[in-house]
């Protein structure tokens, strides 16, 4: 009996896991040391927060599942000189919402909603790449100065 219960719990947990959505973007940035190829990979991470409480019979429950999606971005840039620059950062609250009830019962539907917004995610990764260009240029300037000055 314990074996059946444990197997059921494992299967229940396995079916609740949803693969993370990823989106990629590649661009070329001009720099005085030469062109830089930059690749950005955004992985969407959804967090859930249970709020409210269960009410006694005959009263309305205040249970809600508040969720938000963040994009974890990995940047890999390679300069013409062979220098490789990597950076990881997070863009918070690219999507959010709430559902009535327990978070565990809504994880799959929330994941589907986030997947339906993947076109918006492409816009977010392009915007993140644009914001990162100045940071990347500054990193390249520092690396170029170190190699030039010894």
What are these regions (language model features)?
Residues 4-13:
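Sec-dependent N-terminal signal peptides
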Residues 17-83:
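N-terminal secretory signal peptides
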Residues 99-150:
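Compositionally biased, intrinsically disordered linkers/stalks adjacent to structured regions
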Residues 61-62, 91-95, 112:
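Short, surface-exposed linear patches
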Residues 82-101:
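A short, surface-exposed beta-strand/turn
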Residues 3-4, 18-37, 130-150:
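A structural "domain/chain start" motif
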